[in-house]
């Protein structure tokens, strides 16, 4: 019998991001209860030795599964060390991979308190409008003029700690140059 290969898209991330992601998920699952029905699977609950953890996020009748891996191919730098994450959408027996932006949008629409375009209609009709959004990155598209006006009126309140974001987990910070503040007293930073 021949070998059967299975290809999986895995975003390479550093170990600290995996720790931060797991910490945020556990905080909002057990402390704030915003993610109370999310399921967290530890590495010892998986049959795959490369799986570090898996978070099952129910969205309607399906699940978004965010799986973190360890012990993958070594990265270009020491901090890469072969950690990665994959994101799947599962409905019964059907599975497909999705990108982090789509996953965040689906999670945002289902879990986070948010004013949406329906808030414009509610405001015009004089009904009560939810005045906050816990995940502003979910509104990355250009909105209507009324929606932008409503966003201008609503005060932004930051959550401490932030809600878990798949997009933030997979963002590529390695290829972006580091921004180091130039301090007058620091000679080692600017080479003088």
UniProtKB/Swiss-Prot annotation:
Processed in virion by the viral protease. Pfam families: Vif. Zn(2+) binds at residues 108, 114, 133, 139. Residues 151-164 are annotated as: Multimerization. The record marks 150-151 as: Cleavage in virion (by viral protease). GO terms for cellular component: host cell cytoplasm; host cell plasma membrane; membrane; virion component. Residues 151-180 are annotated as: SOCS box-like. Keywords: AIDS, Host cell membrane, Host cytoplasm, Host membrane, Host-virus interaction, Membrane, Metal-binding, Phosphoprotein, RNA-binding, Ubl conjugation, Ubl conjugation pathway, Virion, Zinc. Induction: Expressed late during infection in a Rev-dependent manner. It is a peripheral membrane protein. Residues 14-17, 74-79 are annotated as: Interaction with host APOBEC3F. The modification Phosphothreonine is found at residue 96. Residues 75-114 are annotated as: RNA-binding. Coiled coil: none annotated. The BC-like-box motif mediates the interaction with elongin BC complex. This is Virion infectivity factor. The lineage of its organism: Viruses, Riboviria, Pararnavirae, Artverviricota, Revtraviricetes.
């Amino acid at each position: 019998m021949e070998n059967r290969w299975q290809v999986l898209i895995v975003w390479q991330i550093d170990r600290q991001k995996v720790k931060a992601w797991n910490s945020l998920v556990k905080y909002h699952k057990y402390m704030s209860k915003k993610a109370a029905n999310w399921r967290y699977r530890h590495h010892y609950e998986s049959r795959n030795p490369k799986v570090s953890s898996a978070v099952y996020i129910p969205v309607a009748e399906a699940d978004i599964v965010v799986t973190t891996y360890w012990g993958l191919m070594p990265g270009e730098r020491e901090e890469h060390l072969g950690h990665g994450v994959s994101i799947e959408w599962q409905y019964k027996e059907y599975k497909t991979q999705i990108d982090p932006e789509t996953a965040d949008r689906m999670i945002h629409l289902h879990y986070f308190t948010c004013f949406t375009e329906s808030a414009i209609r509610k405001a015009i009709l004089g009904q009560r409008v939810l005045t906050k959004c816990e995940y502003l990155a979910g509104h990355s598209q250009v909105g209507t003029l009324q929606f932008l006006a409503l966003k201008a009126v609503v005060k932004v309140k930051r959550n401490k700690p932030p809600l878990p974001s798949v997009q933030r987990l997979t963002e590529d910070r390695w290829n972006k140059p580091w921004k180091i503040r130039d301090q007058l007293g620091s000679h080692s930073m600017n080479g003088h």
